[in-house]
Amino acid sequence: AIEIVDDEFNLSRREIINVPLLGQVAAGEPIFAEQNIEGYFPLLSEDMPSGEAFMLKVRGESMINIGIYDGDQIIVQKQNTASNGDLVVALVEDSATVKTFYKENGHYRLQPENDSMDPIIVDQVDILGKVTGLFRRYH
């Protein structure tokens, strides 16, 4: 038989937060618009970043070198600033993208973590948040 010997593992006493899972974002629409929310994902509050958060489903293979794969769901702390080397969700030409952020010589480089892909170089970028976690289903 299994016996719980520590109250720390008692899930009934832990706070659950429902994090919005955002779907595809249409051009020109605010990413956080109600129609972009596909559902909610329950996470323990202690596993959450501080502040507001959301989740996005990853599409594509631009981040495979750091273990983020097509179909993964990333947990994102909502913020509009980033430091060099941060893994961010950025809005570029009305599309959300996950890349490593760098500010260089008056422009921004959004670096894919896939050796076969080129960076995105832009003069202006909107940071939606910093990636703080990942959820993956094994099929």
Where are these regions (language model features)?
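Short, positionally conserved secondary-structure boundary motifs
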Residues: 1-65, 103, 107, 136-139
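C-terminal regulatory/effector modules of DNA-binding transcriptional regulators
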Residues: 66-139
